Amino acid sequence: MRATYDQHMAAPAALRDQLSRGLRDLRISVTDRCNFRCPYCMPRELFGADHAFLPRAELLSFEEVARLVRVFAALGVTKIRLTGGEPLLRRDLAVLVAEIAAIPGISDLALTTNGSLLSAQAEALVAAGLRRITVSLDSLDPELFQELADSRISVQTVLEGIAAASAAGLPVKLNTVLRKGVNDDGLLDLVDYARAHGHTLRVIEYMDVGTTNGWVLDQVVPSAQARACVAAVHPLEPIGDEGTAERWRFADGTGEMGFVSSVSKPFCGTCTRARLTAVGELFTCLFATSGTDLRAVLRSGATDAELLRVVGGRWASRDDRYSELRGLSTVGVARAEMSYLGG
């Protein structure tokens, strides 16, 4: 039976966590599966052919996801981002996009993808109400791209997907995780590609998400270093901060780019983001060790008001600030993997 949304459920006034941070953004993982095996997310030695992915019955249904989005919207969330795994592997994803796009209070609906399946789905996603798209792209070099993705899928396939998304009317952002000595020498090529096509490149510091990605501090390229590299060729002017990214415009007027500095310049103090896994666990930090099982609450027959209390109560007790404490008391602590949390 379809759950009835309670239009009158009352949200706590000015919901804040223990550090006075509001709840504004929700990232929703719709699948734990991916057709890439990027080493910082799903290394093949741990996610091989015999890896047991989640059974379909354990995933939240689209109806359950939409119901939770209504609850989060009542608590102040205005921005939704769909992630994975690779979200475009979830069948009929455009149906979910349409359901979320129709929810009052949601003003921004975006998707993060590796782009490999985008060509065939871009138009349907736009028609359903998707507003923006972000494509992960760590290299333009054909051989290095396939090495980093540990996949037979070519970079050309991803570029065709990006072009299809742009042609369908979606603003495109490109996410690049730089690693020293691995792909940092391709940064300027990515900048030139983004500028030429009117996309926004975001350079992300290599982060220690989960416990299986082999993270070492020596491979982190600090945002300041990456920015200096770009500015030496293409002068930059600061715009300000937007969410997790520091925004900079090109002085010649040809667009902008961003830098996400979770390691060198943590932004925990302004983080307003929650994460919902494909099985309905609520995480209040990308580096969290455990989540809150909302699927169990949903499937127990809870009312929307009860869901509101559970979610609101969890956020009100939130005190996460891992990136500010990195290296102090977090060594050896098992954390959820990026592919599970949705990045």
Feature locations, PLM:
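Auxiliary Fe-S-binding modules of radical SAM enzymes
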Residues: 2-25, 192-196, 206-343
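Conserved alpha-helical substructure of the radical SAM core
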Residues: 2-84, 88-107
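Glycine-centered loop/turn positions within well-structured domains
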Residues: 36, 142-143, 266, 292
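Residues that scaffold the ATP/ADP-binding catalytic core of kinase and kinase-like folds
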Residues: 37, 41, 143, 148, ...
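A short acidic, helix-capping loop that chelates divalent metal ions and anchors anionic groups
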Residues: 48-52, 119, 141-149, 210-214, ...
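Radical SAM/AdoMet-radical enzyme domain recognition
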Residues: 59-81, 89-202
